[in-house]
């Protein structure tokens, strides 16, 4: 966590060659992970790292679709990840995770404090899994997103079953509204997973980068993503 005179900021420098140990500043092999970026974070990204400001605007757009683009030597990938917001009218939605890469730099930006990212860091630290370059880290994040889709889909299904049991006893407007919100969550998930699938296809077609891919890891990503898609469709059809 980064500290300034203004307070605490969710900017972390995690060394991938040192079991994701947190550093005080960027150094080679560090992953810059920023959650809920502040104005100071934006200045750091655009002024110090020279990341195109258009990339940051795209990540800020809550409706931004999964895609990949390049500018000034930087590569931006937007992945839709699941997010649980109990204070929201619809408790399960998806939000953009921006992944920005260039040479030794690997930056992730999310405008929401998700369950996925801190869990991913803890998991990697606990398992002491090696990271072999930026693409390896990218695909591991991709894999983690699908795992979290499956976790939330299980929760959604459990909630749906509970609501249906209530409706069997007596039809109440409040329960019908809950069921509609659950269905909306499933629509969000299905749409985002389809977009992530399209992104994965584009990544696999990057011939100039394919030599840096771990084929076994990419296959794991494909399997988990397909499982999440199939599960979401099954729950939606029930």
Residue ranges and their predicted role:
Residues 230-238:
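Membrane-interface, cytosolic juxtamembrane amphipathic helix immediately N-terminal to a transmembrane helix
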Residues 1-212, 217-220, 224-229:
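Peripheral, non-transmembrane regulatory/ligand-interaction domains of membrane transport proteins
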């Amino acid at each position: 966590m980064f500290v300034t005179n203004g307070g605490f900021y969710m900017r972390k420098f995690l060394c991938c060659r040192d079991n994701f140990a947190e550093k005080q500043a960027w150094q080679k092999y560090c992953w810059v992970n920023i959650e809920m970026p502040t104005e100071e974070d934006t200045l750091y990204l655009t002024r110090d790292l020279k990341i195109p400001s258009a990339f940051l605007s795209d990540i800020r757009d809550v409706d931004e679709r999964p895609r990949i683009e390049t500018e000034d030597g930087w590569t931006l990938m937007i992945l839709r990840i699941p997010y649980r917001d109990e204070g929201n009218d619809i408790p399960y939605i998806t939000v953009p995770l921006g992944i920005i890469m260039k040479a030794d730099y690997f930056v992730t930006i999310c405008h929401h404090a998700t369950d996925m990212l801190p869990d991913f860091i803890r998991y990697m630290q606990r398992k002491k899994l090696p990271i072999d370059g930026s693409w390896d880290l990218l695909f591991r994040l991709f894999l983690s997103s699908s795992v979290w889709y499956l976790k939330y889909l299980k929760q959604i299904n459990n909630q749906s079953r509970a609501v249906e049991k209530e409706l069997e006893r007596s039809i109440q407007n409040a329960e019908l509204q809950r069921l509609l919100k659950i269905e909306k969550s499933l629509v969000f998930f299905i749409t985002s997973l389809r977009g992530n699938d399209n992104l994965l296809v584009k990544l696999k077609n990057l011939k100039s980068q394919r030599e840096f891919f771990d084929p076994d890891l990419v296959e794991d990503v494909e399997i988990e993503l397909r499982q999440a898609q199939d599960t979401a469709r099954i729950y939606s059809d029930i």
